[in-house]
Amino acid sequence: MTTNYIFVTGGVVSSLGKGIAAASLAAILEARGLNVTIMKLDPYINVDPGTMSPIQHGEVFVTEDGAETDLDLGHYERFIRTKMSRRNNFTTGRIYSDVLRKERRGDYLGATVQVIPHITNAIKERIIEGGEGHDVVLVEIGGTVGDIESLPFLEAIRQLAVDIGREHALFMHLTLVPYMAAAGEVKTKPTQHSVKELLSIGIQPDILICRSDRAVPANERAKIALFCNVAEKAVISLKDVDSIYKIPGMLKSQGLDDYICKRFSLDCPEANLAEWEQVIYEEANPAGEVTIGMVGKYIELPDAYKSVIEALKHGGLKNRVTVNIKLIDSQDVETRGVEILKDLDAILIPGGFGYRGVEGKVATARYARENNIPYLGICLGMQVALIEFARNVAGMENANSTEFVPDCKYPVVALITEWRDENGNVEVRTEKSDLGGTMRLGAQMCQLSDESLVRQMYGTPTITERHRHRYEVNNMLLNQIEAAGLRIAGRSGDDQLVEIIEVPNHPWFVACQFHPEFTSTPRDGHPLFAGFVKAASEYQKRQAK
């Protein structure tokens, strides 16, 4: 089977939406029966985003096989059925690390190690490896054409197109076509200069996706085609939309998938986008709305919680309600009190690291528990719920996590010191171990208790969810907490670790150690988020009586 590659680049400015455009195109090609995957190549020097600040980089998306990756991989999984893996995302730092390790081992037989050919060859090998077994691979190059960091990647894809044959490689370039209000027209010059920049590297784009706040007129698209040496039907207008799930239909209506299939000589049926039309219909026709407060520490950049925000929206789709998300800084709860949590239909505490704002989260969990407000805790959100219950219900004064207070009297959450890696080998880690790549990561099996609320929602006794954490519930102190009324609703496959807790005498209080947001999609939703939004609607109705 021959694999075809679509290389996606961006020009003029960053944040044009290359990831969304690539994912939308992949969704159309998948709807034509093709086996599609997407890769993201990040030009930064970090080995992976695992230790990067969420405020700088956005969330870290965790794949099934435990890779800490760029948030764009979350978009990919929400748009196509193919599951991403560690092969779908790599960085400049990862490439250089691999090449330097080979150099130290002597693999290059004393040769002078250079960007060309050693770095570019390593990039090409990764791309080929990631594309194995697929009909079409979309490869998104992070950054903007012209950035010095992107040059090795651009050179590598230029070479790769020659290596595999131009009949199996296609370059798609996203560019900005700004509207000038004073002139009353869109301007094509930035696009022309961006393509000129690509040409100077040796890449002639085959398709241009023109991003604008409005539809780019046909005469302007013809002008772009003429000056950029691109077929007129390959100049696609992609205007701003109120829902990203409309983009597959917009691209299909302009014949982008037909153009690509013809270019690659792929004989496949017409795309059926009925599932996406259903998503758009559900989004456009809600029967009500709810307000959910998300209490976190990285709220100045909503992308830090991208998958959680999307999963809440998916929960809204499944309940035919619009979810209004109110982002609340947990430090504000500490300084201003729980008054700022008034008028919420439900409360969610997402994952996080570090002590800043933790007491605000503990106070939030208590407020939700004592006032019967639906509560969903994720990762740290489960740990603070446990700490709060231990302190205020189980009589364990000053209970805490050893992450925050190492020598506390009741360490109800503690560091896991023994781990099994993907090969089954036992590793011992301590608080002095490296932060990068040393967490419990990826898909893990969980057994649900028969009487639990989550068992009803999932409809199955065992589930698989993705993890990203270093601290766990301390089993040594669990008996006292359970005796006070907390329900252990889910345990790890080996029965050793607590994965889900519930408060039984509460309408809906669920907290999980894993990250359910990573497996939620607009077409299928997720049982926990669908149940959570439903509980918010029911709470709203009770309050209105």
Swiss-Prot record:
SUPFAM superfamilies for the chain: Class I glutamine amidotransferase-like, P-loop containing nucleoside triphosphate hydrolases
EC number, as in UniProt: 6.3.4.2
Binding site for CTP: S14, D147, I148, E149, K187, T188, K189, P190, T191, Q192, K223
Entry annotation: catalytic residues: C379, H515, E517
Extra remark beyond the main annotation: CTPSs have evolved a hybrid strategy for distinguishing between UTP and CTP. The overlapping regions of the product feedback inhibitory and substrate sites recognize a common feature in both compounds, the triphosphate moiety. To differentiate isosteric substrate and product pyrimidine rings, an additional pocket far from the expected kinase/ligase catalytic site, specifically recognizes the cytosine and ribose portions of the product inhibitor.
Xref: HAMAP family: PyrG (MF_01227)
PANTHER family: CTP SYNTHASE, CTP SYNTHASE-RELATED
Record protein name field: CTP synthase
Organism taxonomic ancestry: Bacteria, Pseudomonadati, Pseudomonadota, Gammaproteobacteria, Enterobacterales
Originating gene: pyrG
